[in-house]
Swiss-Prot record:
Localisation per UniProt entry: Cell inner membrane
Family: Belongs to the ABC transporter superfamily.
Topological category with respect to the lipid bilayer: Peripheral membrane protein
Residues the entry annotates as binding ATP: G47, E48, N49, G50, S51, G52, K53, S54
The keyword ATP-binding belongs to this UniProt entry's keyword annotation: yes
Any GO molecular function: putrescine transmembrane transporter activity
Database matches in PANTHER family: PUTRESCINE EXPORT SYSTEM ATP-BINDING PROTEIN SAPF, TRANSPORT ATP-BINDING PROTEIN
UniProt organism field: Escherichia coli (strain K12)
UniProt domain ABC transporter: residue ranges: 6-251
Principal location class: membrane
UniProt-listed Gene3D superfamilies: P-loop containing nucleotide triphosphate hydrolases
NCBIfam families for this protein: PRK15112.1 (NF011692)
Name of the molecule in the record: Putrescine export system ATP-binding protein SapF
Amino acid sequence: MIETLLEVRNLSKTFRYRTGWFRRQTVEAVKPLSFTLREGQTLAIIGENGSGKSTLAKMLAGMIEPTSGELLIDDHPLHFGDYSFRSQRIRMIFQDPSTSLNPRQRISQILDFPLRLNTDLEPEQRRKQIIETMRMVGLLPDHVSYYPHMLAPGQKQRLGLARALILRPKVIIADEALASLDMSMRSQLINLMLELQEKQGISYIYVTQHIGMMKHISDQVLVMHQGEVVERGSTADVLASPLHELTKRLIAGHFGEALTADAWRKDR
């Protein structure tokens, strides 16, 4: 039996803004929610703009502090600020590599920084791990001397994936990571991610608005609307028998209708 890798218990986030001298506005970006993720599983979080899905992703990655709730990985609690422990287990790929990669650093420096910060590896060991990771994502050893602007868009996203993989995490969170790529490059990256998952047992949390991409990459899905989960289940079940009006609308907008089990398998 595959045990739970990541467990989320009643996680929530409320933002408070000052709107005047004596007034504050409260926005409940993510209402209390819970879910689990198993090793080698892909969970898609889908919803419209402002649904809270990116805020949830940033809480999972440790980028923003939850208002309430618990996070556990391998039954070990995660706390806000435990960057070294968390970054060796949960990593993130961002939507736009052009803004998330330091343009003044060579690829070797970009990939070496997490290793220097979070491991005790010697320089030669770090160099070997950098080269190995680059090969894993389809980049050449010669690319170590390149700057990000010297790479094509697909190569930049491969570099973003390499940076996520460099510490050999158990979970990778991808926040609209492939949205800016054309269909050909997107398909290549999806196949690469699935290949790495099969070989290394990586679990993915994929945040997206693209229900077609969700269909091809995920096992389970959470549908979010205005900060709460309005539908959840296996990807096949949700696509074949959606219950919430938002889910039905998203499916109809992409496929034209809900997919039957036979049609889902055939199209997949």
